[in-house]
Amino acid sequence: HTEDADVDPRLAVRTAFAEVLTQHGFPDTLVLSRERAGEVFHERRLEILDHLAEHDPESVRALAKAVGHDKGVVSRDLQALARLDVVEYVDDGRAKAPRLAHDHVAVEPVV
């Protein structure tokens, strides 16, 4: 899973990197560009991702309570992570439950 080649000329590098990761036991890996990775690697967002890796909260509110942050702040972080395809929502009819969209998230090679 990568970004559009017309927008990002490093798409081939990310695609090849994802293929190598798959061959070495890391299927379903999202490979982010360096620029996009900067949007993910904030302490609070990493805390949210760590929690989602271990738990399946029933709602954004439940996640916010679990990580000890304001629901609005967590909701905005989740929206940003969803735009990057890092997080998705499962709608169970009562609430949107945030989940990791991929088993792994990596960053393209820096050099």
Where are these regions (language model features)?
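Short, cationic-aromatic polyanion-contact patches
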Residues: 34-44, 59, 92-111
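Short helix-capping/hinge SLiMs at alpha-helix to coil transitions
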Residues: 39, 52-55
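Pre-recognition alpha-helix immediately N-terminal to the DNA-recognition helix
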Residues: 46-50
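A short acidic, leucine-rich amphipathic alpha-helix
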Residues: 62-68, 81
